[in-house]
């Protein structure tokens, strides 16, 4: 039986859309890659809220660490 791929819908945000992200859990025991994602998003301290452009790259970074970061507002 041939394998078929799932069709995935990609959500495209309107131009200029912003995401508010909040760092909710410490990355002390997290793997190094997760720490690098937190740093790459621009977080410097716990419970910090930052605003980033809504892009596939930012959403991908948030998807890597959903247990550490939450989307406050879209």
Swiss-Prot record:
It holds the Pfam family Ribosomal_L30. Disulfide bonds: none annotated. Keywords: Ribonucleoprotein, Ribosomal protein. One of its GO terms (molecular function) is structural constituent of ribosome. It comes from the Bacteria. Belongs to the universal ribosomal protein uL30 family. HAMAP family: Ribosomal_uL30_B (MF_01371_B). This is Large ribosomal subunit protein uL30. It comes from Koribacter versatilis (strain Ellin345). The gene is rpmD.
